[in-house]
Amino acid sequence: MLSLVQKIIGSRNERFIKKVSRIVQKINSLEPEFEKLSDEQLKAKTFEYRERLANGEILDNLLPEAFATVREAGKRTKNMRHYDVQLIGGIVLHQGKVAEMRTGEGKTLVATLPAYLNALTGDGVHVITVNDYLAKRDAELMSDIYEFLGMSVGVIVADLNPQQRKEAYACDITYGTNNEFGFDYLRDNMAYEKEQQVQRSRNYVIIDEVDSILIDEARTPLIISGASDDSSEMYNLFNRLVPYLEKQEKEEVENEQEQRDFYVDEKSKNAYLTEKGYAKIENMLKKEGILEEDDNLYSPHNITKMHYLNACLRAHSLYQLNIDYIVRDQEIVIIDESTGRAMPGRRWSDGLHQAIEAKEGVKVNAENQTMASITFQNFFKLYNKIAGMTGTADTEAFELHSIYGLEVIIIPTNKPMIRKDHHDEIYGSVSEKFDAIVEDIKERISKGQPVLVGTASIEASEVLSTLLKKKKIRHNVLNAKQHEKEASIIAMAGYPDNVTIATNMAGRGTDIILGGNLEVEIAQLEDPTPEDIAQIKAEWLKRNEAVKKAGGLCIIGSERHDSRRIDNQLRGRAARQGDPGESKFYLSMDDNLLRIFASQSMAERVKKGLKGGESLAFGFMSKVISKAQGKVESYHFDIRKNLLEYDNVVNTQRKVIYEQRQSFLEAEDVSDILADIRIDVAEQLFHDYVPAGSMHELWDLEGLEKALKSDFMIELDLQKLYEEDDSLGEEDLKRLVREAIEIEFVEKTKNLDSGAVRQFEKFSLLQSLDTHWREHLSSIDHLRNSINLRGYAQKDPKNEYKKEAFELFSTMLDNFKYEVISSLAKIRIATEEETQRAQQEWQESMSDIKAEHESVIDNNQRHDEDEQEEAPKVQQVRREGPKVKRNDPCPCGSGKKYKQCHSKVE
């Protein structure tokens, strides 16, 4: 019934395209008129549109004319005319939606349309790319269009100083990476002077490769941190002990003789000790003098030892060199699981990175204390309007809509897509699969067809490279180790009979052009003459035609990725702009996806049915693969959703703190703010010793006097005053305390330079707030680590987390107020020069902070904050009931076994 209705009225996507096509017709009708304008008249349009906006006209009304203006500017400056489908893409982006556009459809050019239109307001537009290279490239490519129309263009990259960043953000349109924009936001909220802040309003953002940034990287918070206590000795100790533990092949074993020390769960990327393993590691720790003879690892005070043990166990059993990470310049560099890129600067959390450093024998760096953090989910929600572009978002449409409120619109291609997608071929073993890939490559290059092979790991790319070398097949390898050569390798990938091996092509950002990249070839010529350029073009045309006749670019996938979207990104490299192309995936039953998520019985049946070198290629297996990928995608979605629920608690608090901090920073005079805080502190202090509405017998006036003297340097004999006049009530005494604190401050500052006092007050407010916020993040992190234990008491951990996080936040705000007033009361107010010097010293002490994009650690661990040096000790309680065994049902009521629930090491 639904399909019948869709045939009659069309899908939602089709109806939307039909609706905006009317706007495209309007833009097209303006083209002849705009072609007649002189350059000066066309440039003057920007001023005209801004005038109309100032007079109350809205952007939607300006859209047809503004888009026609950009199209004409593109023709005159770049000899590039926006196609109708690109205009549709621009409208989609302006409306705050996600435009799914195939590879080669010109997303970079599309972004100029909504960027120009929205920059007319003067509030700035941010264009986000996945790396610095693409940010610089896209800004340089499109700057001619923007600057022709009087728009300024800036680029934010990693090596800019604060002044350069400020200038870039002041531009009408600013390009940069998601990391840089996020870190600048955090750094701005750590600044001590308004002039040190570099960003302005977050008005409108266009995110290129939006699925990669908002989904793949949603589990990886941006963190600014400082070093905490050194724990390298403990990591090195456990790294030495873990290899003595024997791996058990599966969770359950038939008898005790088969039991080993630990087993791994590859789905959740976790490792678990068995009872035998616990006993073994305890004995080793006792021999090392780490545990007392009557102590055990289950004791709450050993939670940090469990932290080191679990991290080292996972490092040895689940994370592999050249697959999950590489060692470069004596540092561990993570490999992005989605793109195969090396990610210098990123670190795993929960001690995993330190454990891998110990495993590989490089320097173990200290774990860090979080000073500021935010997830991309919450950072991009700070913008008034979000839009995105990608080649593959439809499979993630539900998540983009449910979390970000973004609707995905599939944009028609300018020319029909004619790629031929072959059935997957499945082999019994990895070696047979690789042999088949080599034979396929050999056959295809014999007819001049270029081949791009996508692998899931560096190890796989190097194995395949070795096999090709044995067959004397010329090829290029593109993976994390060859990151610097990326652009030149991609430029060559479309040459006839060229073979390129790439680790997960997702996010590469460069089109593969059949016959090679003509623009790159011309750019490489030194002072070319018109004849040189004509000759290069003629040679390129021959190669282009030859590759088309050979079938276009062929994509070969060496295995299926966990996500269908990543597979589609790889496929999307072929058949751009109506070119021919092919794609084919080769799999084996030993591939991670099938080994972990397909049923064991089915895998055994398939292996038995295949003789050496034989393969399967039929629809049933495609369903099995699709189902397995669906499981993984659903699993990851739940993790991201769970992360957001937890992070939203901190995000609400972050907004309060940052808004409060900004008000301090922008205020010329904070004396009124401090006056209000003094009233709050006086009331808080008074009720600590004189409970509201209580009888006189419960008053602790002596304690209140001591607190006033020790914390505020105030001598006030309340007991004597009350004895002399017993008619004094609670409110009278409270007023006396409030007045005493106020008078003390006035007396202290009356003979001082008001400018110095105001500056010192502001510095004290900011410094105290930053210190308390940093300590609060640490407390929240510890709370998050231990909150699942509340399941023992039949309580919902999430609700408990929200409740306790709120209590911690309220306490932190009270402590901040109390400390800042107490400090100002006790400290000698400095001169202006002394304040500036103190401020400089404080900022210098913060100079060793690190900006890190924390990496995804696994699917069962927390992801919103960096690790802390030590979890808080828990009060030991005695068990009232019988001991819960590892295979018994968990007492939390989850229905899971105890070892799979609350016995897990957090």
Swiss-Prot record:
Cofactor binding mode and count: May bind 1 zinc ion per subunit.
A Pfam family per the record: P-loop_SecA
GO CC entries: cell envelope Sec protein transport complex; cytosol; plasma membrane
InterPro entries per the UniProt record, alphabetical: Helicase_ATP-bd, Helicase_C-like, P-loop_NTPase, SEC_C_motif, SecA, SecA_CS, SecA_DEAD, SecA_motor_DEAD
Names of required cofactors: Zn(2+)
Gene3D superfamilies: Helical scaffold and wing domains of SecA, P-loop containing nucleotide triphosphate hydrolases, SecA, preprotein cross-linking domain
Region annotation Disordered: where it falls in the sequence: 853-906
Record's subcellular location: Cell inner membrane; Cytoplasm
EC number(s) given by UniProt: 7.4.2.8
GO biological process: intracellular protein transmembrane transport; protein import; protein targeting; protein transport by the Sec complex
Keywords: ATP-binding, Cell inner membrane, Cell membrane, Cytoplasm, Membrane, Metal-binding, Nucleotide-binding, Protein transport, Translocase, Translocation, Transport, Zinc
PROSITE patterns xrefs: SECA (PS01312), SECA_MOTOR_DEAD (PS51196)
Alphabetical list of SUPFAM superfamilies matching this protein: Helical scaffold and wing domains of SecA (SSF81886), P-loop containing nucleoside triphosphate hydrolases (SSF52540), Pre-protein crosslinking domain of SecA (SSF81767)
Entry-linked SMART domains: SecA_DEAD, SecA_PP_bind
One MF annotation (Gene Ontology) recorded for this entry: ATP binding
Topological relation to the membrane, as annotated: Peripheral membrane protein
Principal cellular location given in the protein's record: membrane
PANTHER family the UniProt entry points to: CHLOROPLAST PROTEIN-TRANSPORTING ATPASE, SECA INNER MEMBRANE COMPONENT OF SEC PROTEIN SECRETION SYSTEM
Function, in words: Part of the Sec protein translocase complex. Interacts with the SecYEG preprotein conducting channel. Has a central role in coupling the hydrolysis of ATP to the transfer of proteins into and across the cell membrane, serving both as a receptor for the preprotein-SecB complex and as an ATP-driven molecular motor driving the stepwise translocation of polypeptide chains across the membrane.
Name recorded for this polypeptide: Protein translocase subunit SecA
Organism, as annotated: Francisella tularensis subsp. tularensis (strain WY96-3418)
Phylogenetic lineage: Bacteria, Pseudomonadati, Pseudomonadota, Gammaproteobacteria, Thiotrichales
Gene: secA
